[in-house]
């Protein structure tokens, strides 16, 4: 599942509908995806999807937001909705491309802790792309330092910080 810095939420759909979209596309046929008759045609599937969305929303503490539209949410709330849309599919891996870059500094620190806790709880693989050394060092259990498309060093953050493989890695890590 993928999470981007731009959130990629549908502005005309509610939080619940945004989170349900990948499930609808994966689990329903054409008739089941139709706006008015879909819920009637595939009642059991729709009920199961609503339950999955509710469970993930509870995990991310966004249950009170399920009936709101993205324009009514803060940046951190939008980020959690985008993450929830990825989580609801129960993927084995997450690809996150600069997911916190649009947030203010205080919210970034808070979301770092939330994502780290989520990673521990889900036990899924997270590939996390960031240009922020603090994010990389605090959130990862294994990291790769890349420059100009080349991998310069791979290892636990503490090893990379204490024993940089090159001057470029040392400059980047600080």
Per-range role (PLM):
Residues 6:
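Serine-hydrolase catalytic-loop signature spanning alpha/beta hydrolases and amidase-signature enzymes
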